[in-house]
Amino acid sequence: MEVKTFAFLQIAVFIALGIQIFAAVTAAADANEEVFTVEYCGMNCTQKSDGTWTECSGKNKDCRCYHESDAREGLCLSTEYTDFSQFETPSNSDLEAATPRPRKTLYPVRNPHGPKTRGLGYDKRILRDRVKFLI
């Protein structure tokens, strides 16, 4: 009875330890500020009879042929490595400066009793005042 209890406790400790290690490794991988992206270029590549590979002329100039060791067919892929640790963390003023702003345009005036006003859909008085302001 004591042996079974001791074995059960050992198994429980090993499971808990395994979960803890898995969580720590996963968190460490997420903290890494490096990104490796792969994009399919929209075409495949094949090995020619002389041993060279067909050119990859896909979406961008960085497309290269990637294939398994003995395969005669491969995929044209574009790879990019970005190390975000080289960039500073943006401040609030940087984020505020990068926030998109609405364009300044003439907005249509809606009639509360029906569709837009006749003509261009703009109140002529507002347009006249804005044009005078611009001149």
Swiss-Prot record:
Residues 1-31 form the signal peptide. This is Evasin P1134. Transmembrane segments: none annotated. Keywords: Disulfide bond, Glycoprotein, Secreted, Signal. Glycans are attached at N44. Disulfide bonds join C41-C63, C45-C65, C56-C76. GO terms for molecular function: C-X-C chemokine binding. Residues 88-112 are annotated as: Disordered. Salivary chemokine-binding protein which binds to host chemokine CXCL1. The keyword Secreted applies. One of its GO terms (cellular component) is extracellular region. It comes from the Eukaryota. It comes from Ixodes ricinus. It is found in: Secreted.
